[in-house]
């Protein structure tokens, strides 16, 4: 937004300072200001590394995060929206608690976050589906990072086409 644009030059370095003081490793701040709303506010659309004083930007926008003990590769440059939906943290925790001994279907899996939490929560088997081959590849990589390849199955398919097929299975 226009208001945030005016203060980000001061705010982002302070955010990095606070996170580093908390023991977080911060190598850069990647901005995703590539939404049409910015143009309505007279701002240009762009995405890229915010320059931090004395720092070279990372070579890649692919990063690893850990949430609830689960490791994720996240593409902040090209991933859907911000690359990871942070607001779903507690829903992913709930899935982990509910998955014990169950067979789970994760539709629209994206990074595989719900599927991974189900598998780590003790699901017997998890199938993760997304229409995007790129998303499925990222979800598969995240399963590998967490040692879950044997519990999970991945499919690149349109969920609405796949559901009738799955429903017909015994």
Give the positions of each predicted feature:
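Non-catalytic substrate-recognition/targeting regions of SAM-dependent transferases
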Residues: 9-84
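Rossmann-like S-adenosyl-L-methionine
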Residues: 55-170
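A short interface-forming secondary-structure element
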Residues: 1-6
